[in-house]
Amino acid sequence: SNAVEGLLNYRFSKRIKEQKTKLRMVIDWFENQVVDKGWNAGFNKFYPDIPTIGCRGYIPSLQYLCSYPSKIEYNSGILPATISVIGKGFIDSTREFAAILNVENSPAFRFKHLWNESTAKPDSNYFTILVALSIISEESFNILNLVNEYLKTIDSNNMRFWVKPHPAMSEKELRNGFDNKWPEEFFIIQGLSSEYIPRSDIMISGMSSICLESMSLGVPVIVVENLRGLSYNPIPEEVPQDLWRPCRTPNDIENEVEYYQNRSDEEINRHKEIGLKIREDYFEPVTKEGVRNFLMLDLP
């Protein structure tokens, strides 16, 4: 269980201290779960003089409360000395329950591709909708069913639907799990999402970090909400709703697709500017200087 793993992490730091292992710094993939608490409690006790960093290298949902540390946790010594986030826009929200926390901006390693220069753009012969599915099967099939129902109400001759399954789901599992006959308009794509986002006009997805990625490239997102539980919205509250819309029904999808499909060139350019601001605020570029600062290495 996680509790046992947390204890093992604690004892790991104790054992390597007993072996007189010298450490310069400690970095933990930080979600502030039990395993992290054991890890940080151990290194704070047995290596009190070295820097400990909790690397929050992901986009936290507002409902993923464990990733927002409390002052009690800080006072209990179970947090890293520094929490690194992937963009300056995440700093204030990370301190929501403990203003005393040392939170620093660091390179967004997993999202380095967002800063790669690309000439890719949507095919003007189609209106391309990228349907990005979740790791949660139930959520993925709910998204597909809604899009399929929407598909029945429109003329889709000039529309193209790219269905991108989560890497944890095979194409066979996707087709077999879909209740209805697989629509011929649905094209399953493989490979990296980053290859398809710039070539899409809009994206339809669920509660996934790919939503903020898409918006940062100026590609609008229709976010399908969860009707059977909490909706883990991955979009920070500070992000304007210009580039995203929540939806629950096929009619919602129809309305929002129509809105984004009929944007003027001026509106599209304005949305790209908003996307650049999102990228600057929430995805710190990976640079040599940024990496050396993160690793506390002396700059040349």
Task: Enumerate the predicted regions with their spans.
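C-terminal alpha-helical cap of glycosyltransferases
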Residues: 281-300
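Donor nucleotide-activated moiety binding/catalytic core segment of transferases
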Residues: 168-217
